[in-house]
Amino acid sequence: MPLRKTKKKKVLPKSPRAPKLQPSELVIITGLSGSGKASVLKAFEDLGYYCVDNLPVDLVPQFADLVADSPEINRAALVLDIREGQGLDRLPATLRSVRQIVKSNVVFLEADDEILLRRFSETRRPHPLGISMPVKASIESERRRLAPIRKVADMMIDTSKFNVHELRALIFDRFGHARTQDHKKILVSCVSFGFRKGVPDDADLLFDVRFLPNPHFVPEFRPFTGRHPKVAKYIRSFPQTQEFINRISELLVYLLPHYISEGKSYLTIAFGCTGGQHRSVMIAEDVKKRLATAGYNVKVVHRDSPK
């Protein structure tokens, strides 16, 4: 009996991996219980950092790898505290390996014993070590256990004289100004349009995306726009789509600081396809996300797409 030939499956080329648009940065927040770590983490979150609370020490190197490799995460902050237990003893050694993976800063928070006692009294929450000992003894024990970590910290903040708002302002001043203030000086608009209805008059930069496969010729996609998940997935499935988004994003991140230095306060980037329904819409959305991740103030406008 003759052997039946089997058809070989067609293997599609993998889409190129998105490049990092900004240098990676990891901030590790640690310190005494009641010193304000939750408030500081919230401040980093408001600055656009990807935030994680109470990650096990043994997972920190893996998280550092993620921050270093992921195009979606440029800046991250995580909290490590006494809840980790004996794992904290390994933190100084872990930090040495993490610093070889990604730029890292350790922020150590502390406060006077009297202030910590008052905060625990006001919140009526037990100290993490206070199940079998008084709060004051727990604070003293925690201070001793965290002493080796305090020695390797890049920044120490005594929160005794700070309220929540002042502590937030301090974090914004130390970590937010250099990274976000200049970015906020310019408003970026990503506009999608159709060439059928003409080119936007206010476009500073214009890109023709009609070289991408057109979903209009796929009957099931015709009623929808590039914002529909299935349509967007279809357009992204082509290697040239990801290559274009990667290259355009890199170009824009290079150009924007130069526009800012010349005093430009807004920039309109237009992406055009035939009807302004599918390809240009999807590209404008994806580029907007990339620029927002890089810290810029970005809005998206779909001129010719149904609202």
From Swiss-Prot:
Residues holding ATP: 31-38
Coiled coil: none
Amino-acid positions noted as binding GTP in the UniProt annotation, renumbered to this chain: 81-84
A GO molecular function held by the record: ATP binding
Classification via InterPro entries: P-loop_NTPase, RapZ-like, RapZ-like_N, RapZ_C
A Pfam family of this chain: PapZ_C
Keywords linked to the UniProt accession: ATP-binding, GTP-binding, Nucleotide-binding
Sequence intervals crossing the membrane: none
Family classification: Belongs to the RapZ-like family.
Summary of the function given for this chain in its UniProt record: Displays ATPase and GTPase activities.
Protein name: Nucleotide-binding protein Acid345_3782
